[in-house]
Amino acid sequence: MKHAELTKKSQANGIIALSVLGLGLFATAVPSTANADDLELMKPGTLVVAVQPYMPYTAVKDGKLVGLDSDILTAAADKLGLKMEINVTDFPGMLASVQTQRADITIGGIAWSDARQKVGLFTDPPYYSPPAMAVSGTASFPDVASLEGKNLGTVTGYVWAKSIAQVPNASPHTFPNAEGVFQDISSGRLDVGFLDPLLITYQQQQRPDMKVRIEYLKPPTNEQVAAHPDYKYFQAYMTGFYLPKQSPKLAKAVSDQIDGMYKDGSLAALITKWGGDPKQFLVPSPEMAAQRRGVDRPADWNPPSIAK
């Protein structure tokens, strides 16, 4: 989730029922072997997790976390010997819980940003969110030039609303929720819809009758972004799990688990499970290392990757 996640998460309510909002739920992992003092936890042996329901990234079902981010964190917690206490809230509540030390960690497609890292800690990226489009039929839109003159849509408040408005001769449209985007693509009124990538694949699974499919956009060049500044939102971005500033040891421990999952293939398996392409989600773009080097990572840091 990039800028305007508050809106994006609120709009997601049209697809995901927030029936467990505000409840404290518990999911048991393996017996705790981690030293609470070493990991700076709020409660000994327990990882307090703040989430907002947003499938297929995060949700709570039968008292357990489900979704891509949930599976990644559950695997990390298991390896660290921690159980999890789950607090369900909304997106601003997630961030506030971490920033005020009412949660040990929050997850759910959270985009790394310089502003956020100043008031919290980010793990290494569990995955990268590629620029994805919802399309129908056999038409192909490989790059931004192919979008010119087309009917383009997204949800009101999403950053892609700025991007599609800058595409030459295109007709930009915004909708109150993702369902409206899907409906107009299915009916042929829209050529392309810009949404979170796994939301598109999840829609494919849940509503195959709509015949909506995902297509990945080749990111714009630096020259194209210079000419159309809001094209920057057509680029991939880093996600991360978000922790309090006071928890560097926990952030390092979770990052180590994430890095190990890149190496052992388990992250690729989870991305595939939830409808993503590992080559799109687990390979950073060239500019990403520089964004964090000397900011919240050492000067020689390299983002984790499945690329050899």
Which residues does each PLM region occupy?
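Bacterial N-terminal signal peptides
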Residues: I16-T28
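Immediate post-signal peptide segment of exported/extracytoplasmic ligand-binding proteins
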Residues: N35-K64, S140-F141, A145-N151, G294-K308
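Extracytoplasmic small-molecule ligand-binding "clamshell" domains
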Residues: A36-I110, D264, A269, K273, ...
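Bilobed "Venus flytrap"/periplasmic-binding protein-like clamshell domains
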Residues: V48, Q52-P56, L65-D78, A111, ...
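Paired acidic/hydrophobic, glycine-rich loop segments that form the ligand-binding mouth/hinge
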Residues: A50, D104-G109, D191-D196, Q203, ...
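Extended ligand-binding regions for polar small-molecule ligands
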Residues: D71-K79, T138-F141, A145-S146, K150-N151, ...
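Acidic, polar ligand-binding/catalytic clefts
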Residues: T74, D78, K83-S146, L217-Y233, ...
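Ligand-binding clefts/hinges and TM-proximal coupling segments of bilobed small-molecule sensing domains
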Residues: K162-F175, K249-W301, S305-K308
